[in-house]
């Protein structure tokens, strides 16, 4: 599934293509997509395919096409502070993007059938927190993943504001999924080859809308234990943040607001995402000559052709040099503010999430 937009050269180029094709339509979703590099969720040796609008699978690891994730993120209508359940959370790519929108007071849970994929997702999550330049630009709701079959969720589990299922749902499992949703919530899942948005408008009332024709592998049916019944799966608890964690959130928020106020006072605009420069297609100019009664196109002589190519290369090189001059070295102003605080080094490290940059 995929192939709806052109391949990108990098993550920003891919996002530009998704915006141009109207798969990404809101700024909040765009920011989340730009913050998480899709290529980071690919295995080494397969990253060349990361910025194509194609699904990717290697063993148990699977990523849907970017156009699918775009439609899902838009259809979920995410807001800060909501609770989210990802059924078939896979690599954690989608859950991490969702966490950037939910913010620190949301709930972000995922259930995945394969234990090796859960470990992979945890590794990628840790790498994002420790290494990503985007982490300090957001308040983050860290995903929590559990291993299990999403058709075996314990009957006393809590309900969620937003739910996504990343596998094909049979019609007889539709009501099972709906039970997990709060009144006023939104469920997005593939049913009968249609990505469908379902809104719970009341205790027993629903509104459904087809979003996109899709092709998903079906949900894996639960296996039974020795007693002939499936084991139930417990979802992560809805834990309340401790005082230390809350203090870190509010200190970072205060410093971030202070930085924004400083920049506004100095008239420094917030840097917008770079507009990707499209590669120009060179057009060869032809001359025309009469041969008999026919007008035949003839290419320009090779010397003029070569001169055009040389001029084009020189122009591109000049533009590249100018762009390099304008490019500012990356600055992490939040980290700089934290490191200047009159606090013990151990507390500064905690405030930076023990990041090295």
Curated annotation (Swiss-Prot):
**Sequence segments annotated as region (BC-box):** 240-250
- Do you know which InterPro entries this protein is assigned to? PCMT, SAM-dependent_MTases_sf
Name a single GO biological process.
Answer: protein ubiquitination
Q: Where the protein is mainly located, per its record?
A: cytoplasm
Compositional bias, Basic and acidic residues, is annotated for 318-331
What's in the keyword line of the UniProt record? Cytoplasm, Lipoprotein, Membrane, Myristate
Transcription regulation in keyword set: no
Please list the residues that make up the active site.
64
* Gene Ontology annotations for the cellular component aspect, listed alphabetically: Cul5-RING ubiquitin ligase complex; cytoplasm; membrane
Q: What's the protein's topology in the membrane? A: Lipid-anchor
Lipidated positions for N-myristoyl glycine? 2
Q: Where in the cell is it found?
A: Cytoplasm; Membrane
Q: What segment(s) does the record annotate as region Disordered?
A: 299-331
Which Pfam families does the protein's record reference?
PCMT
Per the record, the domain of life is Eukaryota
Q: Does the keyword Lipoprotein apply?
A: yes
Which residue intervals make up region (AdoMet binding motif)? 85-94, 160-164, 181-191
In alphabetical order, the GO MF annotations are: ubiquitin-like ligase-substrate adaptor activity
Q: Give the family, as the similarity comment puts it.
A: Belongs to the methyltransferase superfamily. L-isoaspartyl/D-aspartyl protein methyltransferase family.
Oligomeric form and interacting partners: Component of the probable ECS(PCMTD1) E3 ubiquitin-protein ligase complex, at least composed of CUL5, ELOB, ELOC, RBX2 and PCMTD1. Interacts (via the BC-box) with ELOB and ELOC; the interaction is direct and stabilizes PCMTD1.
- What function does the entry list? Substrate recognition component of an ECS (Elongin BC-CUL5-SOCS-box protein) E3 ubiquitin ligase complex which mediates the ubiquitination and subsequent proteasomal degradation of target proteins. Specifically binds to the methyltransferase cofactor S-adenosylmethionine (AdoMet) via the N-terminal AdoMet binding motif, but does not display methyltransferase activity. May provide an alternate maintenance pathway for modified proteins by acting as a damage-specific E3 ubiquitin ligase adaptor protein.
This protein is called Protein-L-isoaspartate O-methyltransferase domain-containing protein 1
Its taxonomic path starts at:
Eukaryota, Metazoa, Chordata, Craniata, Vertebrata
Give the encoding gene's name: Pcmtd1
